[in-house]
Amino acid sequence: MLLSGGDPPAQEWFMVQTKSKPRVQRQRLQVQRIFRVKLNAFQSRPDTPYFWLQLEGPRENMGKAKEYLKGLCSPELWKEVRYPPILHCAFLGAQGLFLDCLCWSTLAYLVPGPPGSLMVGGLTESFIMTQNWLEELVGRLRWGPAPLLTPRGIWEAEVTRAFGALVWIRGDQHAGDLLQLPPAVQELLLSLVRDAAGKEDIIEWLSRFGISDSHSDPEVLICPPQQQKEAPAMVSVGESPGPFVDMGTLQNRGPENSKRLSSLGATGSLITAQSTPQEAANQLVRVGSNNQDGMDSAQEEGTVQATSSQDSTNHTQALLKQRQVQKIEDKLLFQPPVSALGVCPPWKAWTPGPAFGPLWPGAIAATFWRINELHSLHLAWLLSQACFNFPFWQRPLGPIQLKLPGQNPLPLNLEWKQKELAPLPSAESPAGRPDGGLGGEAALQNCPRPEISPKVTSLLVVPGSSDVKDKVSSDLPQIGPPLTSTPQLQAGGEPGDQGSMQLDFKGLEEGPAPVLPTGQGKPVAQGGLTDQSVPGAQTVPETLKVPMAAAVPKAENPSRTQVPSAAPKLPTSRMMLAVHTEPAAPEVPLAPTKPTAQLMATAQKTVVNQPVLVAQVEPTTPKTPQAQKMPVAKTSPAGPKTPKAQAGPAATVSKAPAASKAPAAPKVPVTPRVSRAPKTPAAQKVPTDAGPTLDVARLLSEVQPTSRASVSLLKGQGQAGRQGPQSSGTLALSSKHQFQMEGLLGAWEGAPRQPPRHLQANSTVTSFQRYHEALNTPFELNLSGEPGNQGLRRVVIDGSSVAMVHGLQHFFSCRGIAMAVQFFWNRGHREVTVFVPTWQLKKNRRVRESHFLTKLHSLKMLSITPSQLENGKKITTYDYRFMVKLAEETDGIIVTNEQIHILMNSSKKLMVKDRLLPFTFAGNLFMVPDDPLGRDGPTLDEFLKKPNRLDTDIGNFLKVWKTLPPSSASVTELSDDADSGPLESLPNMEEVREEKEERQDEEQRQGQGTQKAAEEDDLDSSLASVFRVECPSLSEEILRCLSLHDPPDGALDIDLLPGAASPYLGIPWDGKAPCQQVLAHLAQLTIPSNFTALSFFMGFMDSHRDAIPDYEALVGPLHSLLKQKPDWQWDQEHEEAFLALKRALVSALCLMAPNSQLPFRLEVTVSHVALTAILHQEHSGRKHPIAYTSKPLLPDEESQGPQSGGDSPYAVAWALKHFSRCIGDTPVVLDLSYASRTTADPEVREGRRVSKAWLIRWSLLVQDKGKRALELALLQGLLGENRLLTPAASMPRFFQVLPPFSDLSTFVCIHMSGYCFYREDEWCAGFGLYVLSPTSPPVSLSFSCSPYTPTYAHLAAVACGLERFGQSPLPVVFLTHCNWIFSLLWELLPLWRARGFLSSDGAPLPHPSLLSYIISLTSGLSSLPFIYRTSYRGSLFAVTVDTLAKQGAQGGGQWWSLPKDVPAPTVSPHAMGKRPNLLALQLSDSTLADIIARLQAGQKLSGSSPFSSAFNSLSLDKESGLLMFKGDKKPRVWVVPTQLRRDLIFSVHDIPLGAHQRPEETYKKLRLLGWWPGMQEHVKDYCRSCLFCIPRNLIGSELKVIESPWPLRSTAPWSNLQIEVVGPVTISEEGHKHVLIVADPNTRWVEAFPLKPYTHTAVAQVLLQHVFARWGVPVRLEAAQGPQFARHVLVSCGLALGAQVASLSRDLQFPCLTSSGAYWEFKRALKEFIFLHGKKWAASLPLLHLAFRASSTDATPFKVLTGGESRLTEPLWWEMSSANIEGLKMDVFLLQLVGELLELHWRVADKASEKAENRRFKRESQEKEWNVGDQVLLLSLPRNGSSAKWVGPFYIGDRLSLSLYRIWGFPTPEKLGCIYPSSLMKAFAKSGTPLSFKVLEQ
C-alpha cells in the first residue's frame, strides 16, 4: 500500500446506482481502512437513480478503491469458494490482516463463512485473481517441509521466523493455528503482506494498518494522531518532570472502567478491562521520559536502600533519598514499565484485542524486520527464535529475557545484505496477570549520547501469570558499529544519565544472546545475536547503587519499592549480579537471604560479558566482599574471592530456600534438570545434553576490533577466566559466522558443547594493518588489446561483494574489483561488466583507490546502478536484479558471494542457481573454484564457455530420466492427479533398485565370469521389454554382441552409422547368405581370452576387410597385441578396437546407404534405462535401416528432469542431431514411443489402455530448421509425399526492381496508371501512359480497355508500354504509384506462373491471357524491364498520368485490346477434394436411412416422424436411389441430411453470393439445392442469429439479441465450446502474455490463440475472426473463468460488430466448466511448449496445433460432418487457425456438393423452366464470386475501445475458398497479408470514385 506521503492526495468523483447505497454504507469503514482513502457519499437529486461517491487519498489507492467499489456495487461474480478447513485461520487470523491484504491485492469483496467456505464477489478479474490465489494456497498446503540443511530448508526457517513475528504482533485466538501451517503457506501469506505494503516500510505500514474489526471506530483508523486527541486525560505519576501518560478520553467513564486496565495479548495498548474495542481504538497512550535532576519519576510507596563506595557524594545522597508516592485511588495504576516484546502469554489464554491499530507502539518497530525483503536483522528474529522454534503450545511458561543493543546493529548473516536497525521511538507492553492486573508501559526514545557508552535494553518475555519488570543497564558490551540513534529505556536518573529500569526476571543475558529457560530443557536457536547467557541472573555494575523501580502488582496493593538510577560514570571492569523480587508486605524491608553466585572472566584489553545463572533476588546490603552461596539453577559456585551478590527471596527458583522470609512470587517452571541440580564445582564439566555454549575465544577472534565496539569482560578477584557450566536452556552464538550457521539452521538438540576456553588478549598485527600494508604494493590494471575468446560467456561482477570481501568487510576496495576484472581479462573474456551502486562513487573514507572505478567506467566496463541519499538514508535499487537481468539476456555468469535469496523463489531460480560463481581473495590473489557448481558439476572452463543450448539440454537429458507411474506405459495415461504420480512411485523405485542389487549379488555368487544360456534368455527378454518395438533387420543377438559387457538392465551403448556399400556383399541384409552366416558367426565372437581366440578373431575380420571402412586403422591395436605373444595383456585400447571392428562389420552388413530421393523415418524409443533411435527408409515395401544408436540413461536420484515430461523432445532432438550427417535436409517422418519395463508379460502389456501418446505429437516440435523449412519437412512427412515445393527465392522473375537513387536520365521512363469507374449501370475502364525518353520528347497516351476491372486496366498499361517501348535500345523502367500493381509484377506474377495461373482453391485466375502476354513480352527482351514505385501520389507525373487514365476510361482515347494471335495459356482448374457421395451422406443420417428403407419396403412412416406429413411427397430416384422431395409447384430436390443443413445455409447466406441477404431471398436460393422439414423456420432462425448481419443491417440503436444457430442439446461440432485464458505466461516477442484455449468437447478439437490484453473484447475478437465467423455462436459456452466471463464475451461480440445494445438469448447456456478433460492434455503440453520455445512461443504456436492434429485418433469436425477426410494442397498452418482450416475443408466440400446437387436437379427436372432456373442460379453464383484483384472493404474490429468500422479498399491477393480470402495490404501495408473470412468483408461500393488503394485507417 502506498505511503501516506508518497503521492499528493487527490479527489475523484464517480456515480453508482442508488440501490447499492446500503451496501456502500456497510462497507465504507472497511474501504477506508484497507485502501486508506476517505470515502463520502452525496445524493445529487432525489429523483435520480444514482448518487455520487467522493474518494480522497493517493491516486493509486483511489484507483484500487474505485475498482473495489465497482465490483461491490455491480458484482459480475458472486460465488462461494471452498477450501480445506485447516486454512480457515488464514482468513480470520492475525486480526484479519491477511484477509485485508488479499482484498487489497485482488480488489474482491471477501466474506469468510464457516470453516472451509469463502464468499468471493466483485469484477471477473478480481474473482479470478482470488480464485488463482486460493488454488496456489491450497496447492502449497501439500508441500512438505524441506530438509533443514538444504537451501530451501534454510529459507523456510527464515520464513517461519518472520511469520512467527508477524503473528506475534497481530496475535489473536487463531495464532496457534497459523503457526502450524506449512512453511510454504506461511511464505505465500508473507508475500501477500509484502505486496500489500509495497514500497512502504513494513513497520510504518503496520502501524497505520488497522484491525479488521467491524466494531472499531473507522475514523480513528484513518485520522492522524493529532486528530484523535480530544480532551485527553493527563495522568501524571511521580514528580515533575518525568514519564507521563496521555490517555485519550474514554467513552465510558464508569468507575469500573477507570479502575483497571487489562492487557489483551501482546498488544501493548492500555485499555480498560471492560471497555469495548471501539473505546480502545480511541485511547491514546504516550509515554515520555525525563532525566533532569537525577530524579526517578516513577515514585511508589515503599523504600529501598543501596549504597556504593565509588559514586560521588551528591549522587549517593540522591540515590539514598527516600521517596514516597501518594496512594492513587480511583485512578489508573501502572506496573513498572515493560517492553512490549517481553510478553509471552499462553496462547489459549490470549485475549484478542486491537493489537496494533492506528496507535500501536513504536517499540514493535524493533521486533519485525522488513517482510518485503525478508531480512532477519531485527529483534523479531530474536522473538521468533524465543517463541516459535517449537510448537506454540510448548512455549516456555517462564520469563524469556532478550536484549536489544542500543547503538549496535545486530550481527549480520553473510548471506544477506546489511540493513540498519530501525530506531525505536517508543515501547508499550502489558504484563499479563492471572487476575487481569494492569500492565506497565515504557518509552523507548532516541537519545543519542556519544559521550556515554552504548546501552543494551534488556527485554523480557513473561507469561500472563508472572510479574514483569524492565531495566536498562549501562556500560554493557556491544558488537559492531553503533547506529546514529540509540533507542533507550528511560525512567529517570541523574543529570546526563540515560536512565535505567529494573524488572523482575527469570533469565538474564549479557551481550547479545537470548536466554530461553524452557520446560523441556530444549536449547532454542536465538540467531547468534548474543554472547553466552545464563537464566536467572542479572548483571549490573558493582559500583552501582541501584534502587530499582518496583512493580505494582494490583490496583488494590499500591505499596511499592523504588530503586534510583545508576550513576552516569560506571567502570567497565567490574560487574555484579543484582536480582530482585517483590515483597508481599508494602512497608517491610527485604531481608537478606542466600546470596547468588557470580562467574567472571578477565582479559587484558578486550573483555566480554559472561552471564551466569543466579536466582532472582533484590540487593539490600551495600558492600559484601565475601561470596555467599545459594542453590541456583545449574550454577557452579564462584571462586572464594568472587564479589558477592545480595540475594532476596529466590522467587524464580523452583526450590526456594526455607530461610526465605518474604513470600515468593508465583513459581515459574524451569528445566527439571536445572531445578534439581546440586551445587556444581567450577571444574565440573558441562553435560553433553545441554545446549551449545559460547566459545569465547572464537568470539573474540571474530569480532572486528573497532574503536567504538570495545568489549568488556567480567574481572574476578582470583579465579579469573574460570567459567561455570551453562544452563541447558542457554544458547550463545558469537559472531556473524555462527549466526549464519545456527541463525538459519537453528540449534540442534543434544549438540555437543564446546568446553570453555581461557580468554586472553594479545597485541598481534591486525588484519587491517595487513590490508593497509598491502595497499602499498603497486597494482596496475593492464587490459591488453589482443582479441579475446569469442566462445566465452559474459562476466557480470557484483562490485560491492568483490570490493567488500577484499576490503575485509570494512573497506570498499576498488582494487579488488580491478583484480577480478584483470583475472577474467587474462582468461580471454572481453565482455566484462561491473555493477556498483551510485553512492559508492561518492567521497567516502571507506572507499579506497577509486581511480580503478574511473578507469573501468572509461572503458565502458562499469555500470552504475541508480541510488540516492535522502536525509542520510540510502535509497538504492536492488543491484542484483540488474545483474540477473543482464546475465539472463546475455547468457552470462554472475561473480558474487551472495546467494540472492530474494530471487531464488522467482522465475529466475534455475538461472540464478546455475550462474553464480563464488570467489575469494588470498591476500592480493583473486581466486575462483575449479568446480563452481560442485564436484559433480562442470569445470571452470566449461562453466565459463558459452553453452550450445541444444547440447546443454541434450546433455541434461542423457543424464536424467523421469520415473513414470508403474501403471502406465506412457506419460499420456496420467490423469488430473498426475503430479503426485512420480512422488508415489519413488518408494517403488527404491524397492526396484534394491531388488536389482540383490539380483546382481545372486548372479555374482552363482558364477562369476561365466555366461549361461539362462542369462542370455533373460537378457533377450529384457531387451524385448526395453525396446518393445522390434528393431527392423537388427536381431537382438546382433545388438547384444556389439556390447562388450552385458549390462544387467539391458541398457546397451551401441552406435551404428552407415558406411560405403560393399560391392561384393550385394544388397545389405537381404536375409540370405552370406550376410546371415557372417552375422551368426559374429554374434558368437566374444572378447578373446587367449592368444588362439585373438588369432581366430583377427582372421575372421581379415576375411571381411573389404566391407569395413578404415580397416587398417581399426585393427592396428590388435595387430600390435599379436606381436606380444609371450606376455600379452588385454586393456581398454584393445577392447575399443575389438568393438569398433564388430560395429563396422555389422554396419556394413545390416545398414543401407541413405537415398536422398526417399524420405527418412526416425523411430525413437525412450525407456527407463535406455534411449534407442533407428533411422530407416522404406523401399519395395520393406524397412531398410540406415543408422542405429542406443544410449544408456543414468538415473537421477532427485528426479529433476528438464521439465515434466520434457525428456522426449530432448531425445528426438538428440537423435536428429546425431543422425544429421545422414539426414541432411531430407524430410523426416518422426515416431516416438515410451517403453515401460514395469511388466514383461505380453498379455498384460497388450491389455493396457491404448494411450494417445502426446509424446508422439511432441516429436514434431524439435526440428530446428526455421519455420518454413520445418513446414516443408512436416508437410512431406504427414502427406507421405516426396515432392518438395519450389521455394520463392528460386522462382524466375519477369521484372527487376530499380534501386533507389538511380539516375533516370539513361532510362526510358514510362509513368502508367489505370482507372475504373461505374457509370449508367456499366463499368468503364482505361489507362494512361506518360513516356519520358532522353532521345525523344515526352509522349502522352490514353486508352480504353475491356474487361472493366482496375487490375486489368493496370496490367493493360504495362502490356501496352512493353509493346510500344520494350524494344528501345535504352533500358525501360515502369513507374507507378499503385502499390498493388508493383507487388503483382514483382512478387505475385512469378508465383501465379508457377501455379499455372490458379488461385489456392484451384480456380483460374482472372485475365490469364493478359498475364501470359506480359510474360512473353518480357522474355523476348534482351534484359528484363525495371519497375519502380513512386512514393508521392501528388507529384506532377502522377497527376498527369491519372488524368490520362480518366480520359481513356471516359472514351477519350484509343481502344486497346489483347492481340488475337496471342496464344492462350493452358489453365487446368482442378477440384479440391473428391466428389461427394450423396447417397452415403443420406444414409449417415439415421432418420433418412430409415425412410429410405421404408420406401424400399413399401412401408409407411410412424406419426412421430418429422417427415410423416410430407411422406407422400418423398420418393427415391430410380437411377441413384437418392431420397428426393417434390413440393407443390417446385422441382424435385435432394433431402438434406441433418448434419449438413446448417453448413448448406451458410454456403448460401454468408458467402459473397448470398451477401447476408434477408431470410426470404436466402430461402429461395436454398430451396433450389434441397429440402428438409421445417426448412423455412430454420432459415429464419439462422438469419436472425447471424452475428455478421449486424454491421450491414442494424439500424440506429436497435437492440441485437445474441442467439445461436444451433438447436438445444446439439452434439454437432462447434455447437458446444469450452474456453479458458491461461496466463500470464512468458511474454512473447510480439508482446503476448496470455493464451486463449478453445476446445470442442464433442470432437475434442483444441486450439490456442495468443492474447496481448486479457479483456472480454480481446477474447471476443479472437472468437469472432476464427470461430464464430465460420461456425456461429455456440449454444453452450463453458468458460474456466466463470459463467459471467462467458456472458461478457458474447456481449462484447455484439458490441464489437457495431450493435448499440446487445443482449443474450435465454436459450444460450453458460454452465460452469467442471471438467477440462477435452483439453487438459493440450494445456499441459502448451505449458511445456512455451517453456521450450521461450519468447518465440507465439510465432511457433501452429507447430503445437499441427503436432496434435497429426497423430490424433479422434475424428476431426470435418470428418464428423461429412464422413470423410480431406487434405489441403498447400501448408496453411502458419497463416490460418485450425478452426478456419476446418472451415476451408468444409467450404471445398460444400462447393463440390452444390455442384453435384445442381447437376442432379437439372437431370431430374421435369419442366424446361425448372432447368432454366437451375442454370440461372449456377451462372449467377459464378458471376458474383470474388476473384483475385477485386477490391473489398474489411470490417476492422475495435481497438482501444473504439467501435468496429469498415476500412479499405484492399485487394484480394488470393482466394482459398468462397468464404476465406488472403488480403493484400492488411494488416501490413504493401504485403500479402492475413486470411480473412468473407463474413467480415463486403464488396467495394459502386461509385464514381477511383478504386485505388487507401491506407488503413488507424
UniProtKB/Swiss-Prot annotation:
Q: What keywords sit in the KW lines?
A: Membrane, Transmembrane, Transmembrane helix
List, alphabetically, the GO terms of the cellular component aspect. Answer: cytoplasmic ribonucleoprotein granule; membrane; nucleus
**A Gene Ontology MF term for this entry?**
mRNA binding
Q: Where is the composition biased (Low complexity)?
A: 649-672
Compositional bias of kind Basic and acidic residues: 990-1005
Which residues are listed as membrane-spanning?
1372-1392, 1408-1428
How is this protein situated with respect to the membrane? Multi-pass membrane protein
Q: Where is the Integrase catalytic domain?
A: 1609-1774
* BP GO terms, sorted: DNA integration; DNA synthesis involved in DNA repair; DNA-templated DNA replication
The segments labelled Disordered in the record are 289-315, 424-450, 467-533, 618-691, 711-731, 968-1019
The RNase NYN domain is annotated at: 792-942
Localization terms from the record: Membrane
Give the Polar residues compositional bias ranges.
618-627
Instruction: Please name the Pfam families in this protein's record.
Output: Integrase_H2C2 (PF17921), KH_N4BP1_1st (PF23050), KH_N4BP1_2nd (PF23052), RNase_Zc3h12a (PF11977), RT_RNaseH_2 (PF17919)
Question: What are the RNase H type-1 domain coordinates in residue numbering?
Answer: 1304-1450
Please give the chief subcellular localization of this protein.
Answer: membrane
Among SUPFAM superfamilies, the record links this protein to: DNA/RNA polymerases, Ribonuclease H-like
Task: Return the InterPro entries for the record.
Answer: DNA/RNA_pol_sf, Integrase_cat-core, Integrase_H2C2, KH_N4BP1_1st, KH_N4BP1_2nd, Rev_trsase/Diguanyl_cyclase, RNase_Zc3h12_NYN, RNaseH-like_sf
Q: What else is known?
A: The gene encoding this protein may have arisen from the fusion of a cellular gene with retroviral sequences prior to the marsupial-eutherian split. Sequence and structural analyses suggest that the integrase catalytic domain is inactive.
Query: Under what name is this protein listed?
Result: Protein NYNRIN
Organism encoding this protein: Homo sapiens
